[in-house]
């Protein structure tokens, strides 16, 4: 009998029977007198048969979480032993995240399988009625959802992720720009390069390749190894491009709940208790802990604001503790390590040009490390080069209700070709404070650089003059939430060693919602630099009003703007997205200088490509422009494919020969059954078939896969499928009496199903049988012909014994 991905309606007798089996004690004896016309009692109905032999398609449930579906074959030996022996391959394919080293004592050496239920703390239960296999496994015996043992590096693949646009203005030449990311996957390695091409209105053009890296993930050090041209990464020094090798940590490799900063929550539970953590009125964590001390180090990343920890014990008594939290980017979790080691030759520009020949002569070495203690984070970094040396340290301290503060200092020494030497230092300080759930001083920063301080990113031994070398800089950012309103303020001031005067600037933005959905936005900016005669400023006010037209939600927008150039403008428009593929808009612009324009845009996402077109009519010219984006992807299995998906980590899924089925909301499968889905790297992704468009005559061996892809991987999964012939038959004797009970077989001896009490037989066959036999209780056999019976009608059809 083949497997089912659809659930058929059971007869009232079947429902009652399975309900009884589900709630009855395993020691109770089921009265089988109601079964008539059967020569044998199925094992599923016998008392004590927890694992009746047979072929099943079950939901796999681990610790109350459904992890997917799987084929399950129970042998007569397992039925007799009343225990399942599961192979490592089956457990992995079914998505059971178990550490088998903890079950060494349950290994059946002859069958190379594990009888997990022999462990006193583990249960494996099979439910025939719900067709599910339920595991109860101690937490210490489980593999984490994103454990490196579950990482999938993908299949060999090549892809080109692209975006391009072009425009044509009347009376001018066409201008165009294209950007592409080329990636080649081979084993655990990924070769990646970014490139762009431009064509300007004057007819000139340019092609640029920016970088090229060969990288691989290394789980043992929770980081990436990169070879080629890339960028450094450090919390203390400015980043710069280089040719060489780097080994650096990757926080995305951590479980989702361990990414970003969160304080360590500790306490003592008097009894089995539930610990709930909330922030800004929302629960962000909840866990049941046993009596005694507890330590919660898996609270997912939080922002600024008080954490309210509520402990509810077995009697219902609650105690509450408040943890004031303010974060800074350099603040790490307790025990978290961040590192970066790079060696190579500094590049002089952003282009991939003359590798190991451009840039600063000589090799450099850079190393940085950060470590998180309970409430303190230490960072240190160093750069060594024949003509440049620098070192730096910083301390970031969480102050609880007083916020968080960071202080750091760098020293540098530079030697120039003309014999000059520069020595200097840089000091910095940052402070952040959350005053309430709605008010944050996001950042108050100060940085001072002495006259001789030089960043390696700005160092060139042939040029000792650093233009506009910053002396000091102050910076402030503040945010305030007031009901439906958000206010953001930012300001900065800096001065320079080689120039008199100061540069100042600031931004303000206010957004609010009024009158049941009307959005209002107010923005303003100001800047004044010593090398410009006049300040630069601008302000704008805009409204967005939703309305429904023809059953489609539209948005009408109106805006006013004014800038320091003395230009005042007004714009008005309407936009809508009727479907997830289609969006459109119409806009008009006016200015006090007499300029005016009318433009319309249309975007549509095809299965293979995302497109956009725009037509603009000005007072003196007409402009037509368009853009496209997508990915061209090739694997050995799928061949060449085009998709509008542009993620860095992708999955290629296939249902062989089945067209028009979506997977994870993807574009429909093509004529060969392939489609492409976006995936999140180092996270548990469930790749599931959307069942709405699956043909009725198709049976899937599985409907979902769990994958944990590495960054930039192309993962391949195939959903086994069979086209089946479904028959719903009511079997009757020659005189018209309903035949109750009995197992049916085809002329080839294949199992064709079991006749229910109302004479209904559900047959699911891979090929059309011509004749079916049913053994009666007295030993006689009923034969009936299936010739002329049409499969897959969804209707009950009657057949008669011959």
Swiss-Prot record:
Cellular location(s): Cell outer membrane
Keywords: Cell outer membrane, Disulfide bond, Fimbrium biogenesis, Membrane, Plasmid, Signal, Transmembrane, Transmembrane beta strand, Transport
UniProt KW Transport keyword: yes
GO molecular function: fimbrial usher porin activity
Cysteine disulfide links: 782-801
Its membrane topology: Multi-pass membrane protein
GO term, biological process aspect, one: pilus assembly
SUPFAM superfamilies for this protein: FimD N-terminal domain-like
Signal peptide residue numbers: 1-24
KW Transmembrane (keyword) present: yes
Cellular-component GO terms for this entry: cell outer membrane
Entry superkingdom: Bacteria
Family according to the record: Belongs to the fimbrial export usher family.
Role summary: Involved in the export and assembly of FimA fimbrial subunits across the outer membrane.
Protein name as it appears in the record: Outer membrane usher protein PefC
């Amino acid at each position: 009998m083949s497997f089912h991905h659809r659930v058929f309606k059971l007869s009232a007798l079947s429902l009652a029977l399975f309900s009884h089996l589900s709630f009855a004690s395993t020691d109770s004896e089921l009265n089988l007198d109601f079964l008539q016309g059967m020569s044998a009692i199925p094992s599923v109905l016998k008392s004590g048969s927890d694992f009746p032999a047979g072929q099943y398609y079950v939901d796999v449930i681990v610790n109350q979480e459904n992890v997917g579906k799987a084929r399950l074959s129970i042998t007569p030996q397992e039925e007799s032993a009343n225990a399942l022996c599961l192979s490592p391959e089956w457990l992995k394919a079914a998505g059971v995240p178990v550490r088998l080293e903890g079950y060494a004592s349950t290994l059946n050496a002859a069958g190379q399988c594990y009888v997990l239920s022999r462990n006193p703390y583990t249960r494996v239960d099979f439910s025939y009625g719900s067709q599910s296999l339920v595991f109860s496994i101690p937490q210490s015996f489980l593999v984490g959802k994103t454990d490196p043992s579950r990482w999938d590096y993908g299949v060999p693949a090549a892809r080109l992720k692209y975006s391009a646009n072009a425009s044509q203005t009347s009376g001018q030449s066409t201008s165009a720009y294209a950007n592409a990311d080329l990636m080649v996957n081979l084993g655990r390695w990924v070769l990646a390069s970014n490139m762009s091409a431009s064509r300007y209105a004057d007819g000139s053009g340019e092609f640029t390749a920016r970088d090229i890296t060969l990288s691989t993930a290394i789980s043992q050090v929770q980081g990436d190894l990169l070879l080629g041209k890339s960028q450094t990464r450090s919390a203390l020094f400015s980043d710069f491009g280089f040719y060489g090798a780097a080994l650096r940590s990757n926080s995305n490799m951590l479980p989702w709940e361990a990414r970003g900063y969160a304080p360590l929550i500790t306490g003592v539970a008097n009894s089995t208790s539930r610990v709930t953590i909330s922030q800004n009125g929302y629960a962000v964590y909840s866990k049941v802990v046993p009596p005694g001390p507890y330590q919660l180090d898996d609270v997912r990343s939080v922002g600024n604001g008080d954490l309210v920890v509520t402990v509810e014990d077995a009697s219902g008594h609650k105690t509450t503790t408040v943890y004031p939290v303010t974060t800074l980017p350099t603040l790490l979790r307790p025990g978290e390590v961040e590192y970066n080691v790079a060696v190579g030759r500094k590049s002089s520009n952003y282009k991939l040009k003359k590798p190991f020949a451009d840039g600063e002569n000589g090799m450099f070495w850079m190393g940085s490390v950060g470590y998180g203690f309970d409430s303190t984070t230490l960072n240190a970094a160093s750069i060594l080069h024949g003509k440049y040396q620098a070192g730096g340290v910083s301390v970031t301290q969480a102050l609880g209700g007083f916020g968080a503060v960071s202080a750091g200092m760098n020293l540098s020494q530079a030697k120039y070709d003309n014999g000059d030497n520069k020595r200097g230092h840089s000091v910095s300080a940052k402070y952040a404070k959350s005053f309430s759930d709605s008010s944050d001083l996001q950042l108050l920063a100060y940085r001072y650089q002495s006259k001789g301080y030089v960043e390696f990113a700005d160092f060139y031994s042939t040029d000792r003059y650093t233009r506009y070398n910053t002396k000091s800089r102050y910076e402030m950012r503040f945010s305030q939430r007031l009901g439906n309103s958000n206010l953001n303020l930012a300001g900065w001031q800096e001065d320079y060693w080689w120039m008199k005067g100061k540069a100042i600037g600031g931004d303000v933005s206010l957004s609010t919602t009024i009158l049941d959905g009307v959005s209002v936005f107010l923005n303003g900016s100001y800047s004044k630099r010593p090398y410009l005669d006049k300040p630069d400023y601008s302000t704008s006010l805009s409204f967005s009003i939703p309305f429904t037209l023809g059953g489609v939600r539209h948005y009408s927008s109106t805006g006013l703007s004014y800038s320091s150039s003395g230009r005042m403008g007004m714009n008005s428009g309407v936009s809508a997205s009727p479907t997830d593929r289609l969006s459109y808009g119409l806009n008009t612009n006016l200015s006090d200088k007499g300029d005016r324009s009318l433009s319309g845009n249309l975007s549509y996402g095809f299965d293979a490509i995302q497109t956009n077109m725009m037509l603009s009519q000005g007072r003196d010219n007409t402009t037509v422009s368009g853009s496209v984006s997508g990915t061209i992807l090739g694997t050995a299995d799928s061949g060449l494919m085009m998709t509008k998906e542009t993620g860095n980590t992708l999955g290629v899924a296939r249902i062989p020969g089945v067209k028009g089925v979506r997977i994870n909301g993807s574009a429909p499968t093509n004529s060969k059954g392939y489609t492409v889905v976006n995936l999140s790297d180092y996270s548990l992704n469930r790749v599931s078939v959307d069942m709405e468009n699956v043909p009725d005559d198709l049976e899937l061996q599985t409907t979902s896969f769990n994958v944990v892809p590495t960054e930039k991987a192309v993962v391949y999964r195939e959903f086994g499928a069979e086209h089946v012939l479904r028959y719903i038959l009511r079997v009757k004797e020659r005189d018209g009496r309903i035949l109750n009970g009995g197992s049916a077989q085809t002329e080839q001896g294949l199992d064709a199903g079991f006749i229910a009490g109302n004479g209904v037989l559900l047959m699911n066959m891979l090929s059309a049988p011509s004749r079916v036999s049913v053994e009666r209780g007295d030993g006689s056999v009923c034969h009936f012909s299936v010739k002329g019976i049409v499969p897959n009608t969804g209707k009950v059809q009657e057949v008669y014994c011959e």
